[in-house]
């Protein structure tokens, strides 16, 4: 090597160009490099030089000795060529090391592909040989059977019954007692024949004995034939042993099928847990199985019995399928399609958890219970994962059907999502639909958690859980004991039950929107899934885990313990986030508190307007509306329900008091009456809701024992509607602000309030409305009590408001059609329709 570097290198330009053309560029793969040997100039073509992966020193010495006899120019070319080869080799080694560092998985895949090709070729050759052997042996058997039939036809009539009996014995592979007696009788006859042959030599055979001798000769032929049959019976016994061996191999095949199910489960776990240590252990296990396959192939070549080989061929074909399945699984180690769906599902769950955390920050939930609930939810999810894994280890066949069913369900869900995207939902209903879909998902999740809590006690008795899980179960029992709702939350439960009625009302509205049929199908689909989960849990209690799977279960349990530890840490982080959110009131609550304060001021203002309403009732039907008052009506119509601008309204009211004797003042008061009509409509809507809530309160008697974790989860679930109501109130206030700032645009408001203005002249409906307002007064008191119990107050007017507003009802001669229509709609909507 040192001599080659010290020699001078002088090349003509033509030779250097030729050498540059002959030098191939570095190739990415080893196979292409081996296919392209370096061509040499014409004088040096006798010396074959190919680029191996590693060039040993002996070849270089031989190469140097072969070059000595050539002229100087040729030697210089040959000296230049090994230097170039060394440079190429160094470059190739660096490239190979870089490829090894970058692509270890590609090398493994290539090696496994080569192994699979070799195994497939060997298996095909062995199949051909076995087929040839089977054909030859079948031909031999056919020939033997033909010979047997010919021999059986040649036998005398006396032996026909005996031969039929022997054929039956061949089918049964057992020697009956009658045949054994006949064999003994024939052996005795053989002894007699030998004795008679001795006597033949000594005595002259008389004529009587000649017939006996012929008979004995016939019996000798029969004895030989019986000996042949005995050999055939022994051969049949051997075949019977081979059949037993085949039965044992069938048992092994069943065992391998079970192992296939376990391998599939392990591959799923490989996709789910991106842990390199698990993958290494599983790869070692796969290599062991490949070694077992080679051992079985070696045994296959040694077996001579055709029937055994047939079973082994089937076994090897199954193992080929296993190898292909394992290769597919190795390719799927990087996030398979199932993982992507699971990740999407987890992202959706994270969004729901964030939404729940935001709502928990708004509500006064005890801090201890928040962390416990999250911990329980995490543990319940882990228990579900354990149940699925156990069901997968014990029920591989059922899993295949369930996987097909789940794929069908995924297709149905995609189809439903596609249909949802095609339907045009109004903008106002879009937010409600999204919110209701989230609530439905949360309700289903909570129902699943309730079923899992009931099933926990059964699982404690049936499953042999490791020590980590035993401690976790004890911790769960302690948490269940701690999750008794305090007395302060009992009032919240009642309030949430009332909100449950509002949720049902929203469900009705959702049914009236454009997607009722899809949601019903989804609900039925989820109910079917719940039934399947219950069925799997029931099967899990009945099945006993085999001994081979115990080790796998322990391994999985260790992994689950690690996952639980990570989930606990995540739960602690989420708990800290919740505490931070609880320390600061969210912006929505601040706006709601201001809104409620403004509403309280508005109620006091309404009580002050009671006297004015009494005076206006007499003057409404008598006075016509001049043009100036029409403009004031339109201007004041847009000021109804504006709690932020109460000071402006007070100034307007003072102006109206000064103009009591004038028509303009009366028109302004009429407009104010229209404002109160809108408030009455709002109160009527609340009244319908309160009636429905009172019915539900009578129906839902919450026992003290059940006021546990499920009720607490229902609280969170039912309080999900509050932010949406608050958003609606904020939008309403923003609209009112915009209306106050733009009085010129108020002229073009809808004519609905003008119609109400004309319809206020009919007092015939006063009596029903008075009763309705009296009922409403009691419901408003109940709302005030609930407002004191919760930090999120409810719209609660003063108790004397309704009685004060009663004189402000319309006079005779007018009809309140919109109010009646709204009442009829509310009566139709409550109670909810059960489809």
UniProtKB/Swiss-Prot annotation:
Its GO CC terms are: cornified envelope; cytoplasm
Q: Does the keyword Nucleus apply?
A: no
> In what ranges is there compositional bias, type Polar residues?
1-15, 776-789
Q: Where in the cell is it found?
A: Cytoplasm
InterPro entries in UniProt: Involucrin_CS (IPR019743), Involucrin_N (IPR019571), Involucrin_rpt (IPR000354), LRR_dom_sf (IPR032675)
Superkingdom as given in the UniProt entry: Eukaryota
Q: Where in this protein does the record put region Disordered?
A: 1-133, 150-206, 221-285, 321-342, 381-428, 446-486, 501-548, 566-809
Please outline how this chain is modified post-translation. Substrate of transglutaminase. Specific glutamines or lysines are cross-linked to keratins, desmoplakin and to inter involucrin molecules.
Give any Pfam family that matches: Involucrin_N
* Residue ranges, compositional bias (Basic and acidic residues): 92-115, 159-168, 182-198, 222-268, 402-421, 446-464, 522-541, 566-584, 594-620, 669-685, 711-721, 729-738, 751-775
Keyword terms: Cytoplasm, Keratinization, Repeat
**Is Thylakoid tagged as a keyword?**
no
Q: Which GO terms describe its biological process?
A: keratinization; keratinocyte differentiation; peptide cross-linking; response to UV-B
- Biased composition range(s): Low complexity: 76-91, 169-181, 269-281, 329-341, 389-401, 509-521, 655-668, 693-710
Q: In which tissues is it expressed?
A: Keratinocytes of epidermis and other stratified squamous epithelia.
Quaternary structure (record): Directly or indirectly cross-linked to cornifelin (CNFN).
- Function of the molecule: Part of the insoluble cornified cell envelope (CE) of stratified squamous epithelia.
To which protein family does this belong? Belongs to the involucrin family.
What is the name of this protein? Involucrin
Record organism: Pongo pygmaeus
Name the gene behind this protein: IVL
């Amino acid at each position: 090597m040192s001599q080659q570097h010290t020699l001078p290198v002088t090349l003509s330009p033509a030779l250097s160009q030729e050498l540059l053309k002959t030098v191939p560029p570095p190739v990415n793969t080893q196979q292409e490099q081996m296919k392209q040997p370096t061509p040499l100039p014409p004088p040096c073509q006798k010396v074959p030089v190919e680029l191996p992966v590693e060039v040993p020193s002996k070849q270089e010495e031989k190469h140097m000795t072969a070059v000595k006899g050539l002229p100087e120019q040729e030697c210089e070319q040959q000296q230049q060529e090994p230097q170039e080869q060394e440079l190429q080799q160094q470059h190739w080694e660096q490239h190979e090391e870089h490829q090894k560092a970058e692509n270890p998985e590609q090398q493994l895949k290539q090696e496994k592909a080569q192994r699979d090709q070799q195994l497939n070729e060997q298996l095909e050759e062995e199949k051909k040989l076995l087929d040839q052997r089977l054909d030859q042996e079948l031909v031999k058997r056919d020939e033997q059977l033909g010979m047997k039939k010919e021999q059986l036809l040649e036998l005398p009539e006396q032996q026909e019954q005996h031969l039929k009996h022997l054929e039956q014995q061949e089918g049964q592979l057992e020697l009956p007692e009658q045949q054994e007696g006949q064999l003994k009788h024939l052996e005795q006859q053989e002894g007699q024949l030998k004795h008679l042959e001795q006597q033949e030599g000594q005595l002259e055979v008389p004529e009587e004995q000649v017939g006996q001798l012929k008979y004995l000769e016939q019996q000798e032929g029969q004895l030989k034939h019986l000996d042949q049959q005995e050999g055939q019976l022994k051969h049949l016994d051997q075949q019977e042993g081979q059949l037993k061996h085949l039965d044992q191999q069938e048992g092994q095949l069943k065992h391998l099928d079970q192992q296939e199910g376990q391998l599939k489960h392990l591959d799923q776990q490989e996709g789910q847990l991106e842990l390199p240590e698990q993958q290494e252990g599983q790869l070692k296990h796969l290599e062991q199985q490949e070694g077992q396959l080679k051992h079985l192939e070696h045994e296959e070549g040694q077996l001579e019995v055709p029937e055994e080989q047939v079973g082994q061929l089937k076994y090897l074909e199954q193992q080929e399928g296993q190898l292909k399945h394992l290769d597919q699984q190795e390719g799927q180690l990087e996030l398979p399609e199932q993982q992507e769906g699971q990740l999407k599902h987890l992202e959706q769950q994270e969004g729901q958890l964030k939404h729940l955390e935001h709502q928990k920050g708004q509500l006064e939930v005890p801090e201890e219970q928040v962390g416990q609930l999250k911990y329980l939810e995490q543990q319940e999810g882990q228990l579900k994962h354990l149940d699925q894994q156990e069901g997968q280890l014990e029920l591989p066949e059922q899993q295949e059907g369930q996987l097909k069913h789940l794929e069908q369900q995924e297709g149905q869900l995609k189809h439903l999502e596609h249909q949802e995207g095609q339907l045009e939902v109004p903008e106002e209903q879009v937010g409600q639909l999204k919110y209701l879909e989230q609530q439905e998902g949360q309700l289903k999740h909570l129902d699943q958690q309730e079923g899992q809590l009931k099933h926990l006690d059964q699982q404690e008795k049936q499953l042999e859980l490791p020590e980590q899980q035993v401690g976790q179960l004890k911790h769960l029992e302690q948490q269940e004991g701690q999750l008794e709702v305090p007395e302060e939350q009992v009032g919240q439960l009642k309030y949430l039950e009332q909100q449950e009625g509002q949720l049902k009302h929203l469900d009705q509205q959702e049914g009236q929107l454009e997607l009722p049929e899809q949601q019903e199908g989804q609900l039925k689909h989820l109910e079917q899934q719940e039934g399947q989960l219950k069925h799997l849990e029931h099967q899990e209690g009945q099945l006993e885990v085999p001994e081979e799977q115990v080790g796998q279960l322990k391994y999985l349990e260790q992994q689950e313990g690690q996952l639980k530890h990570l989930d606990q840490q995540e739960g602690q982080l989420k708990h800290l986030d919740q505490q931070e959110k609880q320390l600061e009131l969210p912006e929505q609550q601040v706006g709601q508190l201001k809104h409620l304060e403004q509403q309280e001021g508005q109620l006091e203002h309404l009580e002050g307007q009671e006297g004015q309403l009494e005076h206006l009732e007499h003057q409404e039907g008598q006075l016509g509306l001049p043009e100036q008052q029409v403009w004031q009506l339109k201007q004041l119509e847009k000021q109804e329900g504006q709690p932020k601008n109460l000071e402006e309204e007070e100034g307007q009211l003072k102006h109206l008091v000064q103009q009591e004797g004038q028509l303009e003042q009366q028109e302004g008061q009429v407009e104010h009456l229209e404002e109160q009509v809108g408030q009455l409509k709002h109160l009527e809507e609340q009244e319908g809701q309160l009636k429905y809530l009172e019915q539900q309160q009578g129906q839902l008697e919450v026992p003290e024992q059940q006021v546990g974790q499920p009720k607490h989860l229902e609280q969170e679930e039912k309080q999900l509607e509050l932010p949406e109501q608050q958003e609606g109130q904020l939008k309403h206030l923003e609209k009112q602000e915009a209306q106050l700032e733009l009085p010129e645009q108020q002229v073009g408001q809808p004519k609905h309030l003008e119609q109400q203005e004309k319809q206020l002249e009919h007092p015939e409906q006063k009596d029903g409305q008075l009763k309705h307002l009296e009922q409403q007064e009691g419901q408003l008191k109940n709302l005030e009590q609930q407002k004191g119990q919760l930090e999120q107050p409810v719209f609660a007017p003063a108790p004397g408001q309704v009685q004060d507003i009663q004189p402000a009802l319309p006079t005779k001669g007018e009809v309140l059609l919109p109010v009646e229509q709204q009442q009829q709609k509310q009566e139709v909507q409550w109670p909810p329709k059960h489809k």
